[in-house]
C-alpha cells in the first residue's frame, strides 16, 4: 500500500519527510515501478537502482528552482513519478503516452531531453554558465552512469568543467555496468576507487580522533596539506580532483542517510563537485539483481516467471552474429567492433569464440569508426556493429577517415528504421540521408533475414566503404526467397506486374508485398515489386527500363524523405525525363515519437494499408 507515495501532490513535500519516511517512500516507489513496468515494459533494472538516490535528491533540492539532467535518461522513471506523472505511468512508452526519457514538452521538471549517452555534463555546464551570466545562484545537477562516463564527450566536458570551475554537482551513478560490462581504462580506474576503501576509512578515522582536542584540530589542519600525497599512496590516481573537481566517495547509493549527508555538504560548495555513488541495478527485484543485463529493457512480463527471451523467433541481430562467426571461421582477417553493445548487436557469441578479434571500445562511436579505418588500412576486414541512431555520433569519422581514403570498413547498422517505444532519440531513420552524400559509400539492405547471409558474405570481400542497414526484430510473415548472389548496383524483381512499380528498400519490401496482395484481391491487378538491395548506387539500368515501359513508380523506405532513397530515384528519373507519376513514401520532415512500430507505420502511411491506398490513387 502506497501510503506516502499516494499523498505526495508536489515534489516539495518530500523535503518535509524524515529519514524513516524517506525510506518508506523509496520502498513504495520500488514496488510501484516493479508492478507498473512489468505491465508496460520499459527500462527496468536501471530505474530500480536509482530510486534511493532520486528520493534523496528531492529531499535536498527544490527542482522548481534547481536543475537536474539525467544522462541517457532511461533511469528517470522515479523522477517522473514524483513530478506529477504517476497517474499516467500506465501509458509509458505508448503512443500518446509518457515518454521513456526526459522530454521538455512533457513536464516543466524535464529541463533537458536526453536519450543518447554522455551528454549530461556538457548540457549541465551550459546551464550552470547561463545561470551565472543571468545572475542566478541555483544548482545544476548531472546524474551520469559509469558506462556513460566512458564516452568521449563526457570526458571532454569534465576537462572543461574542472578548468572553468562551474557551479554544478555531478553524481556518478556507479552500478559497475552500463548495458553490458564496462570496458576501458576509466572502468578499471573506477574499480580501483571502489576497492580503495583504505583511504576513505583512514581519512575518517584520523579526522574523528583529531577532532577530540584543540591541539588535534590544529594538527588536522596541518595534515590537510598532506592530503594529496596520502590519496596518491592509498587510492590510485585521484583523477577527478587532479582535473579540478571536489570528489566525495564512495557513497552507498541505497543508504538514504549517507546520501543526505553528502548532498547537504555538496550543495554548500561553490564550484564543481562529483559524488561517487555505488548502486545495484535491479535493486528490489531478485531476478533483475542477478541478471541486470537481461532486465535492462523489458517487454511486459509476469513477475512470478520473470522475463522470457525477447525474441523467441529469429531476428536480424542474432542472425548477424551467427553469420559473423561463420565469416570469421573462414577468414582470419575478419574482426568485429562494437561500442558497448555486444549483446544488443548480436556479437556476444563472437566475443566468446574470437576474443582476439573482438573489440568493445565502450561508448565511443567516433573512436570505433577510426579504429576500424586503421585496421582496414593494414589489411583487416573490420565490421562495426552499431545502432543506426548511434552512428550519427561518428559522422565526421565515417566521412574523413573512411570514405575519403576509400577504406573497406563495413558499418552494420542495427535498428535501422523504426525502433518504436524508445522514440525520437532512437529511431534509425536518418542513416540513408547522412550516408548517401558521402562519395565512395555503398549502402545495402536485406529484404529478409535469410538474405543477411549472402550480403555479409559478399561484404567480406568488398573493397570499399559499405553500410548494411537492417531493422530491429524479425520478419513479417511473408514468403520471400533470399538472393542467391549479389551483383553490384543491381536490384531484384521480386514480383512481376503492370502499370505500377514499387521500388522498396529492406524490410519495406515485406510491407509492399502485403499491400500488393491486397490490390490483387480487390482490383485483380498485379503490382511490380522491386527489391532495391542497393540503396546507393541506384540501379539506373532498371529505372531506364521502367520509364521506357511507362510505369508509375512508388518508392518506399523507412527513412526520412529529405535526402533519402526516394529523392535519389526521383532526381534520376527527372534527369531522364520520366513522364509518369512518381510517389515517394517515407517519413516526413519531423521526429517520430514513441509508440509501437505498427501504430507508427500506420500513422505515417507506411503500413500495408497505407501503401495500398497510395496504389489505389495511382490506378
From Swiss-Prot:
Thiamine diphosphate binds at residues 74, 115-117, 147-148, 175, 285, 365. One of its GO terms (biological process) is isopentenyl diphosphate biosynthetic process, methylerythritol 4-phosphate pathway. GO terms for cellular component: cytosol. CDD domains: TPP_DXS (cd02007), TPP_PYR_DXS_TK_like (cd07033). PROSITE patterns: TRANSKETOLASE_1, TRANSKETOLASE_2. Its cofactor is Mg(2+); thiamine diphosphate. It catalyses: D-glyceraldehyde 3-phosphate + pyruvate + H(+) = 1-deoxy-D-xylulose 5-phosphate + CO2. Pathway: Metabolic intermediate biosynthesis; 1-deoxy-D-xylulose 5-phosphate biosynthesis; 1-deoxy-D-xylulose 5-phosphate from D-glyceraldehyde 3-phosphate and pyruvate: step 1/1. Binds 1 Mg(2+) ion per subunit. Binds 1 thiamine pyrophosphate per subunit. GO terms for molecular function: 1-deoxy-D-xylulose-5-phosphate synthase activity; magnesium ion binding; thiamine pyrophosphate binding. Its EC number is 2.2.1.7. Homodimer. Catalyzes the acyloin condensation reaction between C atoms 2 and 3 of pyruvate and glyceraldehyde 3-phosphate to yield 1-deoxy-D-xylulose-5-phosphate (DXP). PANTHER family: 1-D-DEOXYXYLULOSE 5-PHOSPHATE SYNTHASE-RELATED, 1-DEOXY-D-XYLULOSE-5-PHOSPHATE SYNTHASE, CHLOROPLASTIC. Belongs to the transketolase family. DXPS subfamily. NCBIfam families: dxs, PRK05444.2-2. This is 1-deoxy-D-xylulose-5-phosphate synthase. It comes from Clostridium perfringens (strain SM101 / Type A).
Amino acid at each position: 500500500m502506497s501510503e506516502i507515495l499516494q499523498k505526495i501532490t508536489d515534489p516539495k513535500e518530500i523535503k518535509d519527510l524524515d529519514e524513516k519516511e524517506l525510506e518508506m517512500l523509496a520502498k513504495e516507489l520500488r514496488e510501484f515501478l516493479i508492478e507498473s513496468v512489468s505491465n508496460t515494459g520499459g527500462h527496468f533494472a536501471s530505474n530500480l537502482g536509482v530510486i534511493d538516490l532520486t528520493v534523496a535528491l528531492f529531499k535536498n533540492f527544490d527542482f522548481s528552482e534547481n536543475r537536474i539532467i539525467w544522462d541517457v535518461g532511461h533511469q528517470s522513471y522515479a523522477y517522473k513519478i514524483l513530478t506529477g506523472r504517476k497517474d499516467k505511468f500506465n501509458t509509458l512508452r505508448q503512443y500518446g503516452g509518457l515518454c521513456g526519457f526526459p522530454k521538455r514538452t512533457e513536464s516543466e521538471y524535464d529541463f533537458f531531453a536526453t536519450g543518447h549517452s554522455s551528454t549530461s555534463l556538457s548540457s549541465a555546464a551550459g546551464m550552470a554558465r547561463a545561470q551565472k551570466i543571468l545572475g542566478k545562484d541555483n544548482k545544476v545537477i548531472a546524474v551520469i552512469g559509469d558506462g556513460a562516463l566512458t564516452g568521449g564527450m563526457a570526458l571532454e566536458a569534465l576537462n572543461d568543467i574542472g578548468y572553468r570551475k562551474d557551479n554544478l554537482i555531478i553524481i556518478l551513478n556507479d552500478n559497475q555496468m552500463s548495458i553490458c560490462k564496462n570496458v576501458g581504462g576509466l572502468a578499471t580506474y573506477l574499480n580501483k576507487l571502489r576497492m580503495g576503501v583504505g583511504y576513505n576509512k583512514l581519512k575518517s578515522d584520523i579526522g574523528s580522533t583529531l577532532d577530540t582536542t584543540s591541539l588535534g584540530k590544529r594538527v588536522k589542519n596541518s595534515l590537510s596539506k598532506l592530503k594529496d600525497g596520502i590519496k596518491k599512496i592509498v587510492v590510485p590516481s585521484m583523477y577527478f580532483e587532479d582535473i579540478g573537481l571536489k570528489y566525495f566517495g564512495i557513497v552507498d547509493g541505497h543508504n538514504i542517510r549517507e546520501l543526505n549527508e553528502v548532498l547537504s555538504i555538496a550543495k554548500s560548495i561553490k564550484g564543481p563537485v562529483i559524488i561517487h555513488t555505488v548502486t545495484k541495478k535491479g535493486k528490489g527485484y531478485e531476478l533483475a539483481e542477478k541478471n541486470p543485463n537481461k532486465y535492462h529493457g523489458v517487454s511486459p512480463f509476469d513477475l512470478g516467471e520473470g522475463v522470457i527471451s525477447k525474441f523467441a523467433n529469429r531476428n536480424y541481430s542474432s542472425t548477424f552474429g551467427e553469420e559473423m562467426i561463420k565469416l570469421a571461421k573462414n577468414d582470419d582477417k575478419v574482426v568485429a567492433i562494437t561500442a558497448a553493445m555486444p549483446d544488443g548487436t548480436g556479437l556476444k557469441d563472437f566475443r566468446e569464440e574470437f576474443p582476439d578479434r573482438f573489440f568493445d571500445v565502450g561508448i565511443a562511436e567516433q573512436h570505433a569508426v577510426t579504429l576500424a579505418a586503421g585496421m582496414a588500412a593494414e589489411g583487416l576486414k573490420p565490421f562495426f556493429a552499431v545502432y543506426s541512431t548511434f552512428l550519427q555520433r561518428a559522422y565526421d569519422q565515417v566521412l574523413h577517415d573512411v570514405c575519403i581514403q576509400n577504406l573497406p570498413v563495413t558499418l552494420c547498422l542495427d535498428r535501422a528504421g523504426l525502433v518504436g517505444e524508445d522514440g525520437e532519440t532512437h529511431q534509425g531513420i536518418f542513416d540513408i540521408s547522412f550516408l548517401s552524400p558521402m562519395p565512395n559509400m555503398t549502402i545495402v539492405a536485406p529484404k529478409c533475414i535469410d538474405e543477411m547471409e549472402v550480403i555479409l558474405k559478399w561484404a567480406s570481400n568488398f573493397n570499399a566503404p559499405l553500410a548494411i542497414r537492417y531493422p530491429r526484430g524479425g520478419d513479417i510473415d511473408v514468403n520471400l526467397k533470399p538472393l542467391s548472389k549479389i551483383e553490384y548496383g543491381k536490384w531484384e524483381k521480386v514480383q512481376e506486374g503492370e502499370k505500377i512499380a514499387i521500388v522498396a528498400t529492406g524490410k519495406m519490401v515485406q510491407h509492399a508485398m502485403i499491400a500488393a496482395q491486397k490490390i490483387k484481391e480487390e482490383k485483380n491487378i498485379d503490382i511490380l515489386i522491386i527489391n532495391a538491395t542497393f540503396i546507393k548506387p541506384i540501379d539506373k539500368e532498371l529505372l531506364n527500363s521502367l520509364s521506357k515501359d511507362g510505369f508509375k513508380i512508388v518508392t518506399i523506405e523507412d527513412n526520412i524523405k529529405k535526402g533519402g532513397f526516394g529523392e535519389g530515384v526521383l532526381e534520376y528519373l527527372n534527369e531522364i525525363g520520366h513522364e509518369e507519376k512518381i510517389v515517394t513514401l517515407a517519413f516526413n520532415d519531423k521526429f517520430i515519437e514513441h509508440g509501437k512500430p505498427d501504430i507508427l507505420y500506420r500513422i505515417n502511411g507506411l503500413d500495408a494499408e497505407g501503401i495500398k491506398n497510395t496504389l489505389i490513387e495511382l490506378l
